[in-house]
Amino acid sequence: LYLERIARIDEGENGINSIIELNPEALPIAERLDTERSKGKVRGPLHGIPVLIKANIDTSDYMSTTAGSLALEGSIAPQDAFLVKRLREAGALILGKTNLSEWANFRGKNSTSGWSSLGGLTRNPYALDRTACGSSSGSAAAVASNLCAVSVGTETDGSIICPAQTNGIAGIKPTLGLISRSGIIPVAHSQDTAGPMARTVADAAILLGAMTGVDEADAATGRALSEVEGSSKGLAYQDYTQFLDPEGLQGARIGVARILFGTDKRVIKIIEDGLEVMKSSGAELIEVKLPPSDKFGKSELEVLLYENKSDLNGYLASLGQKVKVQSLKDVIEFNEENRKRVLPYFGQERMEAAQRKRGLTSKRYANALAKNHRLSRLEGIDAVMLEHELDAIVCPSGGPAWMIDLVNGDGGRSWDMDSTSYAAVAGYPHITVPAGYIFGLPIGISFFAGAWQEPQLIRLAYAFEQKTRVRVPPRFLKTADLRVP
């Protein structure tokens, strides 16, 4: 059924192009899992369920792990990512890999979300001339289009939340360390995490629980190395469905961060309607003030540049001589040598800036990282949550999908506010769930909170979802239907 839908909806000139590679072993694996089930062996709720994963997540099978880059074409990882091992143990069927913004959108300044030199352009299923956002573009578009049951995305800043909200699905960006980062092509270790994407909060909760676990290769999952890394030991669950409460808004104290509402009156109206639902469901709303995110905008980029050079060099070196590139420097040179195929629309300024950075012992790096955590955590989310005794903070997840523009990149985006950076920079959890539509284009509402508060956020997001039930499936229109307000 899913393979038929993929052939009909994803492939071809007018397809959404969300999948970069299908698992050639999918059918025999499915047969083996069905046989297990017929014999009474059911591993859990994901047994036999088709899951798509982003193409920057390692699998040691017949599928390559490329981050959408031509430089890694054909690269077969030496072993499964830890989260993939966990999914296979849970009985999930890894159906294939999804397209993404190349290198998880950390290559050039004027990039186009959802485009990679290896996978081409992923489109939004609600309007094919609109962006699917990124960098987890394919993971979101595939789930929205029912090409799989659930998918896995990754985020450094916004790469789960933006595509989830733009494609009208639920997405969870977990606390740093809840899910192992080992076996994921990195952007920056202080912010990188994988997370679930699904059509419902319940499905996202199931997938989240299947991916948690202590990984010896990722200290953040096992012990408290420092304030930066945290620890998931005793704070992770393997079953998040226990927190699905349709009355979860009752008695909740929710902070309203209007600094993140932007200026789009249509978006604001949708969120205000959502706030009324929360109030009528028994939640108490409190107006809160967060420090402007632009205070740590430059320092965030500084940290990402330093870490990108170090982390990517480490990952590429681990692949050995089987790949064409063994370092960030090699990638930059490969891209220049293959400019017509790799750099036709935008450059690699981010990579070049990262290459110029020194090591992680730099005082400049340490100061930027400390500033990030002070503003996003101590003076940001932690301070507001503590002062008002909150269960979560809410804001819009973004605006309506903008028109795809390969000439100018994402510069034409309509959303004028950054609602993802607080939780991303802090390493704290963030959930988006559909809240409404503008001319048929999805708008999501965000819930975020302090470290390890996934249970509470799932409770609130699920209750909101059940009270509103606004999600409608995409119609794969060539362009947005302007007759629909």
Model region roles, listed by residue range:
Residues 1-157, 175, 199, 385-387, ...:
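Gly/Ser-rich catalytic/binding loops embedded in alpha/beta enzyme cores
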Residues 3-13, 23, 30-37, 41, ...:
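Sec/Tat-exported extracytoplasmic proteins
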Residues 66-69, 122-128, 135, 185-193, ...:
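Flexible glycine/proline-enriched surface loops and loop-helix/loop-strand junctions
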Residues 31, 81, 263-289, 311-337, ...:
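Acyltransferase
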